[in-house]
Curated annotation (Swiss-Prot):
Assigned keywords, A-Z: ATP synthesis, Cell inner membrane, Cell membrane, CF(0), Hydrogen ion transport, Ion transport, Membrane, Transmembrane, Transmembrane helix, Transport
Gene Ontology CC annotations of this record: plasma membrane; proton-transporting ATP synthase complex
Protein name in UniProt: ATP synthase subunit a
Assembly: F-type ATPases have 2 components, CF(1) - the catalytic core - and CF(0) - the membrane proton channel. CF(1) has five subunits: alpha(3), beta(3), gamma(1), delta(1), epsilon(1). CF(0) has three main subunits: a(1), b(2) and c(9-12). The alpha and beta chains form an alternating ring which encloses part of the gamma chain. CF(1) is attached to CF(0) by a central stalk formed by the gamma and epsilon chains, while a peripheral stalk is formed by the delta and b chains.
Family label: Belongs to the ATPase A chain family.
Cell compartments where the protein resides: Cell inner membrane
Gene name for this UniProt entry: atpB
InterPro entries the record matches: ATP_syn_F0_a_bact/chloroplast, ATP_synth_F0_asu, ATP_synth_F0_asu_AS, F0_ATP_A_sf
Organism the protein comes from: Legionella pneumophila (strain Paris)
Membrane topology qualifier: Multi-pass membrane protein
Function: Key component of the proton channel; it plays a direct role in the translocation of protons across the membrane.
Any Pfam family the entry gives: ATP-synt_A
One BP annotation, GO: proton motive force-driven plasma membrane ATP synthesis
Length: 230
């Protein structure tokens, strides 16, 4: 587990552009996930699926069912984004367990980027489901005076999403480091178990909140449209 702070520690620079530990680890995770996805799809078989393939199918099926329960009419549209978000955040949270690796989600800039992506996806999926004119109209109905309150709500929940994940992962790693400094390496297994459980929980919460925000945006606008058409 690396050193934590509001921003990841500097690693090196390329042409004056600073490269941090979180950037390096993020690229490592993305490349690793791409290779894993490619190898799974390249070798997949309907007749004789491998254990590796069955594990991935089980994970993706569980995610698909979870999304379907929240947003059944748009699951095909939402699934790629939310599933990718879940997997990336889970791996990012867990990689801090490996000595020498830094959890990107312990860097506020990374969690802020994920929150901004979620913020943009809420509006992107809403516009795709309804059209940009009808979607934007709902922000000024029943009166344009509600627009500032809508904007404040969108910004505040995006900030909360970023800070929640960052704070939990950073505090988890700091707590683990403090315990290890005090007790030494006599109790590594409980610390690792705590880290793994918390990493899974935080990845699930972030992905579920993103899903709820997307579903809320789509369904709220659809309900308003249905009410106006009656």
């Amino acid at each position: 587990m690396g050193e934590e702070g509001f921003l990841a520690h500097f690693a090196f620079s390329i042409g004056g552009l600073p490269i941090t530990q979180s950037v390096l680890t993020t690229w490592f995770i993305m490349i690793s996930l791409f290779i894993m996805a490619w190898s799974t799809t390249y070798k997949c078989s309907l007749l004789q699926p491998s254990t590796y393939q069955l594990i991935w199918e089980g994970v993706l099926s569980t995610m698909y069912d979870a999304i379907k329960e929240v947003l059944p009419d748009h699951v095909e549209l939402i699934f790629p984004f939310v599933a990718t978000l879940w997997i990336f955040i889970l791996v990012s949270n867990l990689i801090g367990v490996i000595p020498g690796f830094y959890s990107p989600t312990a860097d506020l800039s990374v969690t802020a980027s994920l929150a901004i992506m979620t913020f943009l996806s809420v509006h992107w999926f809403g516009i795709r489901a309804e059209g940009w004119r009808e979607y934007l109209k709902h922000y000024i109905k029943p009166t344009p005076f509600l627009l500032p309150f809508h904007l404040i709500s969108e910004i505040s929940r995006t900030l909360a999403l970023a800070v929640r994940l960052f704070g939990n992962i950073m505090s988890l790693q700091l707590t683990a480091l403090i315990v290890l400094m005090i007790a030494g390496f006599l109790v590594p297994i409980p610390i690792l178990i705590l880290h793994i459980i918390e990493a899974i929980i935080q990845a699930y919460i972030f992905g579920m909140l993103a899903l709820i925000y997307i579903a809320g945006g789509i369904q709220a606008h659809e309900l308003k449209s249905q009410g106006e058409s009656l």
